[in-house]
């Protein structure tokens, strides 16, 4: 159960944005059909969870769904995303991770829960409100990322 302001480590994603690898493949960068069975690096996830625990920062772990935006989701879209296995929704991250994995770069990602798409908790939200929630969560997120980078 997520709450506004929670941090979430991405364990996987569902990409509903056009795939950035569509088109001619550049073989020097990676294979035509890159494996995505381990999209997010388990070692980095484990290290981040340890860092969060040491610093008393609660984190969630879940599946991120990437959409094109720029609209926020409808209640029916939120329902659909829960049905297909998503925990959170955003308008970025997955395309960048797909490109990085194509190049065999280990990936790690986190999100801030800025609003809730759960029945009974869906409410009108503005971009400014989303930014405010993100600003409050930013110091915790930054601490985890800085310590994770230092541990590599």
Feature map (PLM): residue ranges:
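Glycine-rich phosphate- or other oxyanion-binding loops that anchor nucleotides, phosphorylated ligands
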Residues: 1-152
